[in-house]
Each structure stands twice: as structure tokens, then as C-alpha cells.
């Protein structure tokens, strides 16, 4: 009956004034409180040792504004009562109300020493808002005073107790006290408890930058990357200046970790947007990315990759001149590496300077192809086509000048910008073969083979011959002959024409003879027979293969070899 009902609030959280009917009810409520007082007094007469009745009586006296009587009754009960914490808490509130701050603080200190802060919860439903506010303000100020003047875990724990009183007195919505207590828990290593307090703030204010930053840092210390990045990004979007100051307050190692996490998140998000969204310039996420990139630059202006990220976002938003000027302002001299040059390359594509674009992009295509795969997504289909044609032509020119290493980068750019066009895969494979990087050359030929048209048998046969030739150069004769056999069975004339070109029919037939003889010695007659027949399709005049076939017939009598 003594507990107050919550005051109505409008949709903005502002308390509404009482209606006349509410004011009429106040007299009824006062009568109820008087009745409670009389009943509690009667119970005390029946049992003078009943602490619960005495506390109920003092609460009624408080609500009837009979403060001195309530104070006197509580003071008398304190000496021999088992309910020390509830009595001390009520006395403290009354002392604050009377203006005796020192006495009130001493009483609160005793409650803290007892360690029973839960006694405040029922009191908060009885005491008036202005009186609760007095306790809240005092306890918060006292906690801050302790934190500013003292050091050590014991003082932090004492401050937490005062802050807990302030939070309870506020009804659980004291933002400043929740923030301070969360930070205290963080200092004590109680990260999850700190996160609980930050979440309490965010429940009322989802975009509170202080709570988001603090919570993000707790997740950082727990090595929870996804959660930390989520909160820090929200904090930056809510109040970038504050979030940046908070990041700067961290130790250098922690600053590096959190900024790299945010950077990687931005990179991933940018790549996903470029892949999934054809009309990405209008996507609001790009504006958020721009804010995050600007914040990263402000946290560490010397980090080149942050400037590169910001440039990429400008390019994605089709702000080409702004991106060009930003690159020129941010990088000069030795700072211009292949990643910076590649961004100039993308801009030159936009400006239709295709040869210059290829020159700027090709080095990165050779060193970090996965990054160029992202950059070409800034280009439309026509721009990519123009780029891979220019890169392919330049690669061919360099081959003629016997500059295979330079040509390789251009072919790599052509492969990437053409989305693994078999033509450029074959050209790069030839270049790699000349440079004796046989394993990479085979990978390119395999990719070309995977993109075969089922009707183009001539091209398929030529690719299998190319792969066979590379395998020969890498001294894998067994695997090489297998590829040539595939080519001959697929399109004989085209395969023989390729073999004539390299390594030559006579030479290859000799290799087939060696492999077939090895199979024969291992008594693998069927394999030896097939190898001999295929070798004779390459060079029908090879006498060794003819003699081997005759030996197989004799040795394998009774075995089916064809």
C-alpha cells in the first residue's frame, strides 16, 4: 500500500501532469497511509521486538511528512535491531533530506561495510523522487571522489558500492553511474559484468557512443573480434570524435588491433558490396564506410592502407577527381608503391588512358592478384574489356622484345580483368613456361581446359598438347604422354599439328617408346600396347615401337592386349 505506482509518461518519456481525478485520489492515498501507520503502531504494541512493524511504521511516518518522528524511531531501533541495513539506509536518506550530508554518508558507509545493498530496493519504491535524487547525486559524487583521489582494487570496489547505490536510487537508469561502474568492473578484470552495465545503458540509448566504445573495448580484451568491431563501428557512426579519442586512450598495441579489425571489416564489406550490388553508388552503406575510413585515418594518419581504403570508397562513389587529388595529396615520392599506382591505374581506366592504366595496374596484378580482382569490380564490362585487350597487346609486344618477366605481369592483368579468359591463360602459360615456372603454367592450362566448349575439339586437343609439352619440360614423361594420348584421341589432325610445332613428331614418338618399354618391363602389357599404338599414330615410321608391339604379342600370348 505504501509503494508508489509509476508516474505516467508520454511517448517521449516526459512525465505527464496529474489529471484532476489523480489529485482527488491523493487524499484517499493519504488516508490509506494513516491507516497503515495505525496498524503498524498496534502491531508494535503487541510485539515491541517486531522490527518489520517498526520499519513499516517509520515508512508511513515518512510519507505523512513526519520526518523527525520517523528519524527518532529509526535511531532508537538501531541499537538492538536485526534489520541493521534497512534501518541504516532509511536513516541515511532522512539525513540527506535534512541536509546532514556528512551524517548521511557515514550511514551509507556502514551499509557498504555490511555489504547488503539489496536493502535499498524496497526503499526506492517508498521514498519520494526528490529524496532518491539526493541520494543518487551524493553517492555518484562520492564514488567519483574516491576514484580521483585513491588507487587500488579496494578503493575501486568501494566506488562500485557507491555507484550501485546511485544506480538503485535512480531506478536503474543512471547513465553516468552505469558508465562509471562498468569502467570500474573493467579495471578489476570483470569484463562480462562491465558489458552487462554497458548493455543496460544501450537498452535505453542504443547509439550511446560512450557505452558502445566501452563495450567494444571489453570485447577487445576478450578477443571477441566480431562483437568488438560491431560496437566500435556503431560508436564511430554515433560520435566519431568521441570514439577516436577513446581509441587514442588505449595502449598502442590495443589501438593497432582494434583499428586493423575495423579496417578488415571495411575491406570485407566493400568487397561484398562491389560483388553483390550493381548500383552500389546509391547504397547508404557507402556513406557509413566513408565515415569509418575517415575515422581510421584520424586514428593513424601515417597508415597508408587507411588512405588507400578511403580512396577506394571515393572511386566506388564515382568521385574520380576527388580520389585522384586525394592520392596526390596523401602519397608522394617513395610512398608511391604498387598499391597506390594501382589506384591511379583504375582512375586512368575511367579517364580512358588504357595503356597508362595497364602500366600502373600490372605490377600489383603480378604480386597481389586477389587485390586487383577487387579493383576491376570498380569497372564496367566495356572498361574491363578495353583494359584486358590493352594489357594483352602490351604483353605480346614485350614477348617479342624477349622481356618475359615484364610481359608476365601484363598477362596476369589480362587474365584477371578478363575473368580468366582462356586466350590470356594460354599466353601467360607460355610465358611462365619460358621462365621455367612449370607448375604455374600447368595451373593456367588446366583453367583453360576447364573452360572448354564441348564442340571445339581442335582447341581442346591443342591445350592437352600444350600441357603435355610443359610436363615434358618438367621431366614428367608419364603424365606428359597421358596428355598427348587425350589430345590424339580427341582430334588427331590438330594434335599432330601441335606436336609438329613442339616438341616434334620423331622426338615425341621416341618418348612414347621409352614409356611403353618401361611398362613392358613391368609386365603391364595392356598399357604398353596402348602407348605403342598411340606413338605410331604420332610417327608411323618409328621402328622401335613396331618391334615393341611384336614383342608384346609374343610375351602376352593368352592375354588380351587390344
From Swiss-Prot:
Keywords: Repeat, TPR repeat. Signal peptide: none annotated. Residues 1-30 are annotated as: Disordered. PANTHER family: TETRATRICOPEPTIDE REPEAT PROTEIN 34 (PTHR44874:SF1). The keyword Repeat applies. The keyword Protease does not apply. Residues 19-30 have a biased composition (Basic and acidic residues). TPR repeats lie at residues 51-84, 175-208, 210-242, 304-337, 388-421, 423-455, 461-494, 509-542. InterPro entries: TPR-like_helical_dom_sf, TPR_rpt, TTC34. The lineage of its organism: Eukaryota, Metazoa, Chordata, Craniata, Vertebrata. It comes from Xenopus laevis (African clawed frog). It comes from the Eukaryota. This is Tetratricopeptide repeat protein 34. PROSITE patterns: TPR_REGION.
